Amino acid sequence: MQKLVIEGGKPLEGEIFLHGAKNSALPILAGTLLCDGETVLENCPRLTDVFAACRILTHLGCRCTVQEHTVTVQVRDLCADTIPEVLMQEMRSSIIFLGAVLGRSGSCHLSYPGGCELGPRPIDMHLDALRQMGAHFSVHGGQLDCTAPEGLHGAGTVSYTHLR
């Protein structure tokens, strides 16, 4: 392992503030669907994708509020298992909601993120991993219909090397 050694005449002390990262916040926001009650994310970036994720959560029946860099998600019973195409196209990473909705309700209906066609894209890794966990998929006119009739279950270790 490499290391960086800094030698200087003054000891370092103090605090720094690191901004939240979108790539961390979005999966956590999707994961709130698997929690009952309220989840509070602090230090969340104020980015278009975070607001798009909140719109998806709201459509699914959650209450999502953003105040400065704090996002609060209140999850009760989901009132929907369908994410409309217009919301799926708002961000490329909207596929991250698939597993959480499927795990919570046993079914999920959505279009491909950003309107992309089925092909060798990162979405295939999501589908393959969920298949190993008990999910079934069918495609109808650009819509992906997903079910987990017996619920999602552990699949040992799902790693990239096990996926096609």
Residue ranges, per PLM feature:
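Hydrophobic alpha-helical hairpins/lids featuring a short glycine-rich hinge
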Residues: 81-152
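N-terminal amphipathic/basic leader segments beginning at the initiator methionine
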Residues: 1-9
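Conserved small/polar residues in nucleotide/adenosyl-binding loops
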Residues: 161-162
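Glycine-rich, N-terminal phosphate-binding loop and its surrounding beta-alpha-beta segment
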Residues: 42-113
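N-terminal glycine-rich anion-binding loops that anchor highly charged ligand groups
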Residues: 2, 17-42, 51, 63-71
